[in-house]
Amino acid sequence: MGGGGGGFPEPEDSVLFRRGTGESDDSDVWDDTALIKAYDKAVASFKHALKNGDISEASEKPKGTPKRKSAKNKSQRKNTTSPSKQWKVGDNCCAIWSEDGCIYPATIASIDFKRETCVVVYTGYGNREEQNLSDLLSPTSEVANIEQNAQENENESQISTDESENSSRSPLNKPNNIRSRAAPWNSFLPPPPHMPRSGLGPGKSGLNFSGPPPPPPPPPHFLSRWLPPFPAGPPMIPPPPPICPDSLDDADALGSMLISWYMSGYHTGYYMGFKQSQKEGRYSHFN
């Protein structure tokens, strides 16, 4: 562009922000790890509060820790607690993870008999934590906890399965009722013909219809007596018939289309002939 003051600015003048050129550029600004951890922590705290019926802050579980139910009460822990003199290094046990209060299987790595404490390594996670010997639980505690969780999960899945079956069963019972209600005539237009059960296909020369042939046209006096006059507004167009799962075959669709063409031409020809006969009757009356 020209050098006048009213010209457009150069492309570099329109840049609002360019990453990596400023002195205050900080790559940590683009790291959302802390945000993700905060969100996961908030969700875990909310779920933990719902399970226990109270509000308590739940921090991160051991690495890869699945969801486990916390111990119901302290009496359950005391019933499964073994005396401290029975524990030795390498024994399998169950310990309560201090971060979430849930029971996990662990192995005793070291024991301090003077302080009556030990260091346990959580099986499958590798986390190490110091525990009191009196707080250790027998391995059967974890088995009972897993069985209880499995039973609760099975009950929840059964409830959700029953609800989905009920919701899917209710609409399946309606097509027969819909068809029976749609049978009576709602206007002066005749009901659609029955769907043919067979039609064109490989090795077939034509259509074979199982339904009876269309009835002959009614006489004019019957038509004028029983059919109401045409409305003054636009003609009423019936809605298309519902698509049934058993009529989604190509041959059935083709047969339905040919039937509709035939019925349309049939009624159109009858109406045109009826109007022609009326017109000829008026001419003969004047002559």
UniProtKB/Swiss-Prot annotation:
GO BP annotations, alphabetical order: DNA-templated transcription termination; nervous system development; spliceosomal snRNP assembly
Positions with biased composition (Low complexity): 149-160
Modification type Phosphoserine: residues: S24, S27
Listed GO MF terms: RNA binding
Keyword RNA-binding carried by entry: yes
Region annotated P2 (binding site for SM B), chain positions: 234-261
SMART domains on file: TUDOR
GO cellular component: axon; Cajal body; cytoplasm; cytoplasmic ribonucleoprotein granule; cytosol; Gemini of Cajal bodies; neuron projection; nucleoplasm
Chain segments carrying region Disordered: 1-28, 51-86, 149-221
Positions of region (P1 (binding site for GEMIN2)): 9-40
Compartmental location: Nucleus, Gem; Nucleus, Cajal body; Cytoplasm; Cytoplasmic granule
Biased composition (Pro residues): 211-221
Cross-referenced InterPro entries: Smn1, SMN_C, SMN_G2-BD, SMN_Tudor, Tudor, Tudor_SMN_eumet
Bias kind Basic residues: ranges: 64-77
The keyword Transmembrane helix is annotated on this UniProt entry: no
Gene3D superfamilies: 2.30.30.140, Periplasmic binding protein-like II (3.40.190.10)
Segments of skewed composition (Polar residues): 167-179
Keywords, ordered alphabetically: Cell projection, Cytoplasm, Isopeptide bond, mRNA processing, mRNA splicing, Neurogenesis, Nucleus, Phosphoprotein, RNA-binding, Ubl conjugation
Oligomeric form and interacting partners: Homooligomer; may form higher order homooligomers in the dimer to octamer range. Part of the core SMN complex that contains SMN1, GEMIN2/SIP1, DDX20/GEMIN3, GEMIN4, GEMIN5, GEMIN6, GEMIN7, GEMIN8 and STRAP/UNRIP. Part of the SMN-Sm complex that contains SMN1, GEMIN2/SIP1, DDX20/GEMIN3, GEMIN4, GEMIN5, GEMIN6, GEMIN7, GEMIN8, STRAP/UNRIP and the Sm proteins SNRPB, SNRPD1, SNRPD2, SNRPD3, SNRPE, SNRPF and SNRPG. Component of an import snRNP complex composed of KPNB1, RNUT1, SMN1 and ZNF259.
Family: Belongs to the SMN family.
Name of this chain's protein: Survival motor neuron protein
Native source species: Bos taurus (Bovine)
